[in-house]
């Protein structure tokens, strides 16, 4: 198998197309609109479920005939439509692809260890961290699902473990599969364990979950028995904190690639981009591009998606316990801290969007996705420039407002500056986002 490169050639960045993911309808790197890219994305970053989950089609139903559960009418594993291969409610007596029976809402098991109470968390200076498994910490595929290009890269049914590439064979219930750990996954767990009591929560079956968690945590030092699977979930189509005894909203942080899986806990959620390493996963989410495995590429360790998440977790943890200290242990709520951390990114920036006749005015008006993102990050958005304006966001360098920014020595940036800040949870260097003829095209 050829050696996998991490991140590709920096000199050629950004690597678009294919687009690595979309933030509220825009590519997180180049800023292209999703509807203009013909599905050319490896994964979807921080968007709504309708943006994130691509319809898998009936072919997927055949490869996942017993679906573990459905989110917004799509199988949580293969992406097939709920009507394509049976619904979760009709499969209660069946064994799913991972071998566990799909549990009815009234009959979950209760084997999940109890979460520490608030007093214990405050004493140990820890919070609760719930991590999704598939597409967040790793990606798995069946050995017979490799594409022709992947087979040419050495991905065959006879493939062996390759720890150097973090590729491992697993066989839950005798189904041969290959799991690829996401770069930085083990480092994330090692560093986060000092700040959090950690759980894995997946809608997949328990044996599949436990086999893959063992790859991440072979000695059980990070998770122990704190693994929530479809057996423990009360519903096959959503996740809820009530399956973890003692878990309180005010002390729980959630990291997941699917926001619709947590309809009751959106304020606890740190939404991240979906990890789709194998071609079969790209196909299931309807991305007609070469997979990372096909291209011999992977996310970078030092500044990939999980490294970004760890940085956010550090800030949330610090913010929570700073609040505990300031209020003598009272009223600290991690949900408010997450909003505050997010809202600090562009705090102090007053942004005005500049349009040209060639651009879609709806793209930058009030309540548009880019306007909402800027406000979520703490910026003040205005319709017209004045002495308080700090940034003019434009694609065309010849607009009146763009010229005003140059004349008044204000920051003139293209829209990617806001999108990148949202992806990285940090204000970006304005010089890296110039407005020129290329951005106007």
For each predicted feature, which ranges?
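Long, acidic (Asp/Glu-rich), low-complexity accessory segments flanking structured domains
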Residues: 1-126, 138-160
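Core residues of folded domains in eukaryotic genome-function proteins
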Residues: 21-28, 71-74, 124-137, 188, ...
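Interaction modules related to DNA damage response and DNA replication/repair
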Residues: 27, 42-43, 341-417
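Short coil/turn segments at secondary-structure boundaries
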Residues: 31-32, 87-93, 141-153, 204, ...
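Eukaryotic beta-rich interaction modules
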Residues: 55, 107-122, 129, 179-186, ...
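Substrate-recognition element of Asp-dependent hydrolases with the DxDx(T/V) motif
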Residues: 180, 185-214, 230, 351
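C-terminal folded domains that constitute the principal catalytic or ligand-binding module
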Residues: 185-186, 259-334, 346, 369
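Substrate-recognition "cap/lid" segment bordering the active-site pocket of phosphatases
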Residues: 206, 210-250
């Amino acid at each position: 198998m050829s050696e996998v490169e991490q991140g590709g050639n920096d000199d050629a960045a950004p690597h678009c197309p294919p687009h690595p993911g979309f933030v509220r309808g825009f590519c997180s790197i180049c800023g292209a609109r999703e509807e203009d890219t013909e599905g050319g994305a490896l994964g979807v970053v921080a968007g709504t479920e309708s943006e994130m989950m691509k319809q898998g089609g009936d072919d997927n139903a055949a490869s996942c005939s017993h679906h573990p559960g459905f989110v917004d009418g799509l199988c949580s594993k293969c992406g097939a439509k709920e009507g394509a291969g049976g619904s979760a409610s009709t499969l209660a007596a069946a064994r799913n692809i991972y071998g566990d029976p799909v549990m009815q809402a009234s009959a979950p098991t209760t084997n999940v260890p109890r979460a520490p109470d608030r007093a214990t968390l405050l004493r140990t200076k820890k919070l609760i961290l719930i991590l999704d498994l598939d597409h967040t910490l790793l990606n798995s595929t069946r050995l017979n699902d490799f594409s022709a290009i992947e087979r040419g890269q050495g991905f065959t049914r006879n493939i062996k473990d390759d720890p150097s590439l973090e590729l491992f064979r697993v066989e839950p219930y005798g189904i041969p599969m290959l799991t690829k750990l996401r770069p930085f996954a083990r480092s994330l767990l090692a560093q986060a364990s000092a700040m959090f009591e950690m759980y894995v929560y997946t809608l997949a079956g328990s044996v599949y979950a436990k086999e893959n968690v063992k790859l991440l945590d072979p000695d059980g030092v990070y998770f122990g028995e704190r693994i929530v699977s479809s057996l423990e979930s009360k519903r096959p189509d959503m996740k809820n904190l009530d399956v973890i005894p003692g878990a309180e909203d005010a002390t729980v942080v959630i990291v997941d690639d699917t926001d619709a899986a947590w309809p009751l806990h959106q304020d606890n959620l740190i939404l991240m981009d979906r990890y789709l390493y194998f071609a079969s996963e790209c196909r299931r989410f309807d991305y007609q591009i070469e997979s990372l495995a096909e291209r011999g590429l992977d996310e970078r360790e030092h500044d990939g998606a999980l490294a970004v998440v760890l940085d956010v977790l550090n800030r949330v943890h610090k913010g929570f316990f700073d609040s505990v200290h300031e209020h003598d242990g009272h009223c600290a709520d991690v949900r408010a801290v997450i909003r505050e951390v997010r809202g600090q990114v562009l705090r102090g920036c007053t942004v005005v969007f500049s349009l040209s006749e060639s651009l879609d005015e709806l793209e930058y008006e009030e309540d548009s996705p880019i306007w909402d993102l800027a406000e979520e990050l703490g910026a003040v958005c205005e319709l017209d420039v004045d002495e308080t304006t700090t940034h003019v966001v434009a694609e065309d360098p010849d607009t009146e407002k763009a010229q005003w920014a140059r004349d008044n020595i204000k920051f003139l940036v293209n829209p990617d500056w806001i999108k990148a800040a949202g992806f990285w949870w940090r204000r970006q260097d304005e010089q890296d986002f110039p407005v020129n003829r290329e951005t106007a095209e």
